[in-house]
């Protein structure tokens, strides 16, 4: 998590520990904080990413480039951003961030949905906006960080007028105050809709509850961020390791 960069020398200690694996057989490039929103994830989720390369597998040029104080853009293993947080600074061919409204496109309300992950949501009551998880999501903005430890206090899809909700039209249409569903959290994390999070107990097999599903989603690296990391390595593979 990003907080590791705020601890005294923690990042450097971790980098040195990784480098010492297999008697110093790994080349570890300086860690970097990546914001998932810069890669098409509709969520402000920042994570520290470490890369370690087995020295014996790298080409001589790759070892030289990856050991440089400043790694060239060509050899840089970190993925190039695909989306930008400020529309003001986007070039013509660059894309603004994906917002929550776009992420929720096509989702029905829980009572109308046939998807069990869209039917289920935390019933924890509103506790006042001074507490964590008591805000409603901003549909035109980036989603909140989906947390694994939340004790039911998942952010709200919408609040009532009484609690300061701003989606008045939705409320007037009869939609209730409620927290984010499991599927909505999964959409914010960029999981595909065919990923089943809630599994009923059947034929003696173990089950997964809505509470457990929230935790699984919150613990995950957003799949779209992971994809961009992997694709960058794939694109540079021959350059790093030869033909």
PLM features per residue range, with description:
Residues 107-243:
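C-terminal target-recognition/interaction regions appended to catalytic cores
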Residues 1-140:
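Class I S-adenosyl-L-methionine
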